[in-house]
Structures are given as structure tokens and as C-alpha cells.
Regions:
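Short, catalytically relevant binding-site loops at active-site mouths
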Residues: 196-200, 238-241, 305
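C-terminal appended segment following the main domain
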Residues: 260-318
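N-terminal "assembly arms/tails" that initiate or stabilize quaternary assembly
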Residues: 1-73, 309-310, 314-316
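Long, contiguous amphipathic alpha-helices that act as assembly "spine/axial" helices in icosahedral shell
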Residues: 44, 69-139, 180-195, 278-303
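Short helix/loop capping segments that flank catalytic or ligand/cofactor-binding pockets
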Residues: 52-55, 94, 200-203, 303-304
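Extended, solvent-exposed, turn-rich assembly/linker loops in the middle of proteins
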Residues: 131-220
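Short, cationic low-complexity segments
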Residues: 213-227, 314-318
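Glycine/small-residue-rich hydrophobic helix-like segments
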Residues: 221-283
Length: 318
């Protein structure tokens, strides 16, 4: 029986707010939550070939063609926390409200994990395969820009060794040009930059560039500045790839030669869908002599375009 002090409505609003505050990028994408099919899948139609335009068409009927639309899809992942028991003795004897603390741990862990997974889902695509089933693909190398700064020692915290070329403002300008060339909408462009790559970017700016960048910061909403049309966010971990270009899973330990990456996107080019959010509570459990709590959130996402336009990476280069 659910604890009346913690109704499901409160949990749902609490976890959504925690997701928003911990992961600003969750709100900076297209929301397809209302299009979830069967509680776990979202299909995104992909328009077929555009019609040709003929100047001064000659006499006679034009040939009618049918546009062959396709679809891409993504499933919602189910994120759950390990159950936590609060014994009756703890509830009666400790000097702080442990239930609130435990729920804070659950929401914080869920938010951090989901934030990492959503970024990964934007570079991973699933689409229906001919004859049934699905195929999986990843952001192609043509949408990845290597860093081009001076050789800089990596940080040992991520498990890397050696040096990588530093991330500079010039790579951001190249990404801006790529988006412009692809006719990607010029508003609502964002960049999520790994912490050390962000520091390298800052170091590459001139005094005037730095002043302009800092003047556009909105730290309350997680924005550290704007440059070349991109609104910058900073995060301790974003993405990582092997030297062969294979994406590391979120939370996976890195090899010494792996490379970190920062992601760039336009808001309408990537998506998320939030499904069920539920707090499980087993009050006065006779086996644990107390209350047991755990949480569940269903969420998924991907790049909305099969051609991957509107998404790009800046990847460390040796």
C-alpha cells in the first residue's frame, strides 16, 4: 500500500523536476511523449523524396509519382533503482528524515543515469528492417569533427593516457558551418561539452570572445555561454569512442586510448519521450521490519532524422 505522505502524483512531479534541473538537455529537445505506442515504442515518420520543380513546363500532363515514406523508431528504456529498506528503528531513532534522504538518493541516481543515456540515444538509431525486425546504426563519422588544437595531456580521471589535441573555438565554427550547409534551423542550437574539453575551449578564446561568451551565461538554467550560434551546456561526462570509432556505453570504463566527445544539436532534430514514472513502496514489511522504497522511470530518445542532420560531435584526436 502506498504511503499517503508520498502520493504517486508527488513522485511524478518530483522526478520530472529533478530530471529537468540535473539535465537541462532533457528539456532542449522535441518531446514525443504523447506519441508513445503500447507504452514503450515511438515511431517517427520520414518523408520520402521531395517533388522535382520544372521551370516553364512544356505542354502535356506531368507524370504523377507516389512519395515513398519510411519510419525510424525507438523504444523506451526502463530505469529502476535498487530497493532501499528503512527499518523501524532507523525511522524512530535517527536525527534526520531518512525517508526524504533515501528518496533524494533514488531521484538523483535516476536523473544522472537517464541524462547520460539520453545523450547516447541521440547518436544511436533504430529503424524497421526490410522483412521484419530492426537495424541499429550510429552517428556516422561524416558528422564528427576532430579536435585540432595543440597536444594536451589528458585527465587521468577518465582512464585515458597520453595527449589529445585540444578542443578550440575553431571546431565550433566548423560545426556551425556544417549545420548551416545542411539547412538546419539556426535557432535553438545547443552544445553539451565535457568538463575538460570545455576548459580547453575557454582557454582558446580571445579576451573579447571570452567577454561575449560569459555575458550570455544563464547559470540558473545550466547555460554557461553562447558561441557561434550554439548555447553551451557543460557536463562531467558526455560521450566517448574507441580509436575505431565505436561508441562506449554510458558508464562503461574507458580504455587508455579512447577519446572523449562533445555533442551539438538543434532542438527539433533530437527527441525524447517520457513514459511511466512510479514509486514503489512496501510499508511495514515483516521481513525487513520497516519500509522498502524503489523507483521506476521509462524514457527513450533518438535523432529524429534518418540522415542525422542537426546532430554532430567534436571528438578528441591524437
Amino acid at each position: 500500500m502506498a504511503n499517503p505522505k508520498i502520493p504517486q502524483e508527488f513522485w511524478s512531479s518530483y522526478i520530472v523536476e529533478k530530471l529537468r534541473r540535473t539535465n537541462p538537455h532533457i528539456m532542449l529537445c522535441f518531446d514525443e511523449s504523447k506519441y508513445i505506442k503500447g507504452g514503450s515504442v515511438v515511431y517517427i515518420p520520414q518523408a520520402g523524396t521531395q517533388p522535382s520543380v520544372v521551370k516553364n513546363r512544356g505542354f502535356g500532363a506531368a507524370t504523377a509519382v507516389q512519395r515513398g515514406d519510411t519510419a525510424v523508431m525507438y523504444g523506451l528504456d526502463v530505469f529502476t533503482t535498487d530497493p532501499t529498506a528503512i527499518t523501524n528503528a532507523e525511522a524512530n531513532e535517527i536525527s534526520y528524515e531518512k525517508t526524504d534522504s533515501v528518496l533524494g538518493d533514488h531521484t538523483g541516481t535516476l536523473a544522472e543515469t537517464i541524462g547520460d543515456e539520453l545523450t547516447y540515444s541521440w547518436v544511436k538509431g533504430v529503424k524497421p528492417a526490410v522483412g521484419g525486425g530492426t537495424t541499429v546504426e550510429f552517428l556516422p563519422s561524416g558528422r564528427q569533427i576532430p579536435t585540432a588544437g595543440t597536444a594536451t595531456a589528458v585527465n587521468a580521471e577518465d582512464g585515458q593516457t597520453g595527449t589529445r589535441k585540444a578542443f578550440t573555438y575553431k571546431e565550433v565554427q566548423l560545426m556551425q558551418a556544417k549545420f548551416n550547409k545542411d539547412n538546419v534551423a539556426r535557432d535553438n542550437r545547443y552544445a553539451m561539452v565535457e568538463s575538460y574539453m570545455y576548459q580547453q575551449f575557454i582557454d582558446s578564446l580571445s579576451a573579447n570572445q571570452m567577454a561575449a561568451f560569459q555575458a550570455t551565461a544563464d547559470l540558473v538554467n545550466g547555460v554557461v555561454g553562447k558561441f557561434a550560434g550554439f548555447t553551451f551546456l557543460e557536463r562531467s561526462s558526455v560521450l566517448a569512442l574507441t580509436t575505431a570509432g565505436v561508441f562506449r556505453l554510458p558508464g562503461e570504463a574507458l580504455e587508455a586510448t579512447d577519446n572523449l566527445a562533445s555533442i551539438f544539436w538543434q532542438k527539433d532534430s533530437v527527441t525524447k519521450a517520457l513514459g511511466d514514472t512510479k514509486l514503489f513502496q512496501d510499508m511495514d514489511n515483516p521481513l525487513y521490519y520497516g519500509d522498502i522504497h524503489s523507483g521506476l522511470v521509462k524514457m527513450g530518445g533518438r535523432c529524429r532524422r534518418q540522415d542525422w542532420k542537426g546532430v554532430g560531435l567534436v571528438v578528441q584526436a591524437s
